[in-house]
Amino acid sequence: MEAEKTLTNEEIIRELLDLLKKNTMKEQANDVFEICTYVDGLEKKIVSMTEELTSMQDQIKKMQEDTLINNAKKALTEAQERLNARCEQIKSQVFEIKVQVKSTAKNIVDETKAKGGATLCRVTEFVGIKKRLLNVRTEVFRLYENYCKKMMQHDIIGLTKAA
């Protein structure tokens, strides 16, 4: 997945934003920038959650071997695996949206160069992308809440073990 370059720094996005601003479509430029910022933020959040899930997995492996801990360890491992799978699923959705945003921007820019500024009205295609993105964003927040609950359980087990 192409996580090294943020969508807001993509050349084609910058070009589309410039075209929109030059054609007095500042509101549409702001909408496109907002969508790109959402995608960038979601990518960062998913990377952070993936790192934390990996850390959680490492901590689970280090837990002592006794029955109570083993039961908790098994439950936490299963929860961590479910969260990790869901995180990967959402990461894939965000990547698809990112590709769609770049493709739509490229099509609009290319068409504008070929046919003129009137084709910038196609920027309304980003509205559909925004709706999809907001749905993914909601999923990320649900996943993060679930992750936080599991981490609290993990911390409680750690305190019990220490006592």
Give the ranges of each region predicted by the language model.
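Extended, low-complexity amphipathic alpha-helical repeat segments
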Residues: I97-A163
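Extended amphipathic alpha-helical heptad-repeat regions
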Residues: Q64-R82, Q89, Q93-E96, Q100, ...
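Leu/Val/Ala/Ile-rich N-terminal alpha-helices, chiefly Sec-type signal peptides and the beginnings
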Residues: M1-E88
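Generic detector of well-ordered alpha-helical segments enriched in charged/polar residues
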Residues: R14-L17, N84, K91, C121, ...
